Amino acid sequence: MRTLTTALAAVAIALPALVVPPSLAAEEKDKTAKDDKPILCQGHWQSEAQAILQLKRMAATYSNLKEWKARAAKIRTQILTGAKLNPLPKRTPLNPIVRNKRSYKGYTVESAAFEARPGFFVYGNLYRPLGRKGDRPGILCPHGHARGPEGGRLRPDQQHRCATLARMGAVVFSYDMVGFGDSEHFGWNHKHPQALTLQTWSSIRAIDFLQSLGDVDDEQIGVTGCSGGGTQTFLLTAVDDRVKVAVPVVMVSAHFFGGCHCESGMPIHKTAALETNNCEIAALTSPRPLKLISVGGDWTKNTPKVEFPYIQNIYGYYEKPSLVEYSHFADEGHGYQLSKRQAMYPFMVKHLKLDPKGVLNKKTGVFDETGNRIEKVSTLRTFDEKHPIPKHALKPGSPVKF
């Protein structure tokens, strides 16, 4: 069992380039001062140097597995409380709608929706493997904040990700954030004050939806998303232990807390009782398999020397340090481009026991996406003139009752 000294050394030794200046003491005092009210930590709320000091403070609160589990439980409770999901709301009927199956090479796509709360619909697409029998792994694919007519779950890179995973045997659900895709089409705005609550709850209910389908293995649930979808990935994994494998992409950072109110607009990171950051929240995945994918061109640039060593130390308490990995692309920028998908696929194959036959080129190690069909936005939509949205759907922008 490793000691606190080891935990601190893992971060401090790995980051010789990030020296904490003496003048930081006063500034740091303001950051650590306790307040009766929760504090919102948004965007670049603290510097990289302050993040290292914070990691040291947090590591000082535990030195063994029992103490880490106790802290993890407090973090989990703080996330749910801050998101106004504590206690967890009653599971209301999903009333799922799945329609318009399209068959392609090795997989099918269907348009789908369910009610996360009465009248509040979550829209998405189901990708399923063809020619596979028995229960299959289920994978959730939340999306990031990319806008435009083909933004969110409608993006070609999101379709490639889902189709490729389905061709390898997974049942994949790609779904809208509030105010994106079909949600935006029907009038919802991403600035909805309950966005963080709604998206976290929608992700929890998305697991319920997968498990209700009848062909998904309840014990093999994975989730992967990029940017804002990366935030959803580690928040969901932190609060719902049904997730067995997680791959957050270009989002796990000790110094960046998410720039959108749907990520950091509610007090999930800092209260008078406890401070945390997204690096530590991602560590709540332990001891389940976790892969961090990071780049040199955004706030995940320090992953190899800061976030990964901190998280791996926690996996060491479970004696499973090999279950957390990272792939770092020092010369690349933000996004879920092909290189990042190629880093994610083998991790999902390994831990969800997917079958890459017909997709993976064993000679080159490349997962072939050329067999995927990129669909039009109109095809991806769940409701249209012939299939209107149910009349009891909430008016766009309405407060959602919990």
Indicate where each model-derived feature is located:
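Positively charged n-region of N-terminal signal peptides that target proteins for export
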Residues: 1-5
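Alpha/beta-hydrolase fold nucleophile elbow
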Residues: 215-227
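Cap/lid segment of the alpha/beta-hydrolase catalytic domain
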Residues: 130-215, 251-267
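Signal peptide processing junction and immediate N-terminal pro/mature segment
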Residues: 18-28
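Bacterial N-terminal signal peptides
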Residues: 9-19
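Mobile cap/lid helix-loop segments that gate and shape the active-site cleft of serine hydrolases
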Residues: 243-288, 295-308, 314-320
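Alpha/beta-hydrolase-fold serine-hydrolase catalytic core, especially in secreted/extracellular enzymes
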Residues: 26-121, 286, 293-402
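Glycine-rich nucleophile elbow surrounding the catalytic serine of serine-hydrolase chemistry
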Residues: 225-236
